[in-house]
Amino acid sequence: IKDKNYYKITVEHLLRHQGGFYRDPLFSSNDVRNQMQLDHTPVKEDFYKLVLRHNLRFMPGESQRYSNFGYLLLSEIIEKVSGRPYEEFICEEVLKPAGCYDMHIGGSYYSDRFPNEARYYTHEGEGKFVEEFNGSGVMVERCYGGNNIPLLSGAGAWCGSPAEIARLVASINGRPEVEDIISADAVAQMTEYFDKETY
């Protein structure tokens, strides 16, 4: 670790996008492979090495910058503390108590779709075709093969039907109609307005 200020980053900093990471490379597998001169598709450890060899942009907690990388770290922390795979822990300890039984970490390709998973489309204005994330050189739809979705883990890989997502939100929103799976204090902390920017 080049910058010793990394040791000052807390779980709360990660949750609030206040870690100070210099960039967010998770949607740039091919760039990471080229930059690090890898002979394989980048794995989590490669992303860690890339980010940790740079200085932080700002001291942890002093500013905010959206960070998928921070949420990847949170996924790893959950695995380390629980001793269980991230997806298994979240399904058993969060989603099932909320009444959600059909949410999953998604796949990268159309063929990976779960039975109730939506068909994705590329937004107008985005390049529809990009190089496949694994460096094959094959051009694919951005939403099917453009990114390594399972690698994202807690940083945006979850998929679920609108009904499942509504159940989850209802179980953590602090409203009385549905019993919350977290405490009122946790709801208040989670929803506290803490920044004047965009997140």
PLM region spans:
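Short, surface-exposed loop or secondary-structure junction motifs
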Residues: 3-199
